[in-house]
Amino acid sequence: MIKITIVTCTFNAEHELQRTLDSVFKQSYADIEHLIIDGLSTDRSIEIAQAYKQHSDEAETGHEILVCSERDKGLYDAMNKGILKATGDYIVFLNAGDTFPLETTLEHIAHSIGDGEALPGVIYGDTNVVNDDGHLLHRRRLQPPEKLTWR
């Protein structure tokens, strides 16, 4: 089974974070590592993240959850911390306020990847931009890059 790491970067996002955590909690796919990387928030973000971890553990979702709160140098530093802590085969960035469109999103992704020896190096998809009520504002379609480099 393919392990998917979700990295959620957050900083003082108490009003946005819960919907992101709920979206991950509801995923039907079990082999999930969820890293919540917080930039030392001064609001209730840490409390919300820790309550989510406890709720997920009690519900026996199978999701591994790590909450890390320490000062960082902004979003990209937090993302890099998440990459370094990740143990999954693939990393998904789902920041505070972001959600998956379906409860089966990760299940569909894992199924489309398969368990073959030749796994794709990058997976990407379109982005739906929605308002606070969840109504679609527009869709951002991505083009595959012509060249990728890894450093």
Predicted regions and their residues:
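Nucleotide-sugar donor-binding/catalytic module of glycosyltransferases
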Residues: 1-151
